[in-house]
């Protein structure tokens, strides 16, 4: 059966639709014909959609939703109205059922369905569920009983039971179904997964909702074979998209060892997200030897009390240790900070900035205001009467909801300016300092740097651009 897959993500710098590509591989392995409409490259989607659908009959349309908004407290830009317009145009040119999926969809499926009007949605792994839907459609059989689906029912929504599949059952990934080379040249990197799921208890995080709380591992040889296919296309900078690459550590070590055995470590430049807690010397060394150039640690705070409130299970001392181990192994370090959760004070912010300032990190990304996703522990906590006044947004389903501790809200940006001063390592929203912009969406400094040939994780590109400018002879 012929299936259309649509990527509606048009943010710049462009990010390759990894999930959509994996879904396409699953459909092809099951014998379906797949055509991909990548709207990232279309200046006029309203014309590209009819040109794609007219003259072709499709039995199923898949819509991949990676992000529902820009996740920025300062801008709060929702992408859902644009997705809704895309669905509306598709409907005019195809009568096939439209099924949404992707990480962004899986976090808030009912809201996305209500706004976009898609027929159904897949929560979690699309490779298996969308393929099962296509198999049923090919036989003209009902598919509404399949697991992981969200369906319209009597003016409301119904979620089918969740089912997960071991990732060793994923088909081989050719990495040729989207234009990864163009994404690399215009977006600076490619993505890959070595696992799915996150068992951590962070109060704000939606990853367990989208990917499950149980970790499922990909065989290291499959991951390295996929990396080899990217390298064969001239793609040398890769971001590992796992929630936390070093959880569990033994699998991370196996991945590094397989890269080294495959002889890819000297050609590959890769970046990852990691947890600061229990980050070991052995892993730091193996990551560097296998080509790791930078790690983004989700530190969140340097204050012990706030770490506990955020559900983090490591101490400030472990943050410092992780940075030291990376420095000693030649790995660039980024710490992501999340300020403004319930209980945040001026004092906890000061302790955080002080700790980060002496951590030796290469860059420190400061997010002020916490995105509140439905279904997280934070979403329940902020419904308390004393916390509701800290909520920002949520005027309707299209408006992203954030929380900012009311006690710090009037002064937090002034305090950050005073604490950080001119330290270039800190990235945070400052309308008077575009070089500090930590919103990657439509970041013109970043877009220009990639156009000039910079590659890698976006925080590291911004670091290198700044450092090059500072050291350039006058």
Regions found by a protein language model. Give the residues of each.
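Acidic, low-complexity intrinsically disordered segments
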Residues: 1-233
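Radical SAM enzyme core and accessory elements
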Residues: 2-8, 50-60, 376-383, 387-474
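Acidic-and-aromatic substrate-binding clefts and catalytic sites of carbohydrate-active enzymes
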Residues: 12, 39-47, 246-250, 276-280, ...
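Short helix-capping segments at alpha-helix termini
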Residues: 31-32, 91-96, 141, 260-267, ...
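Conserved strand-turn element in the central/C-terminal portion of the radical SAM core barrel
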Residues: 39, 274-275, 302-311, 323-348, ...
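Non-cysteine beta-strand/loop elements that form the S-adenosyl-L-methionine
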Residues: 62-65, 126, 284-302, 364-370
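Catalytic cores of alpha/beta
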Residues: 109-115, 283, 343-358
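Radical SAM [4Fe-4S] cluster-binding motif and immediate context
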Residues: 171-334, 350, 354
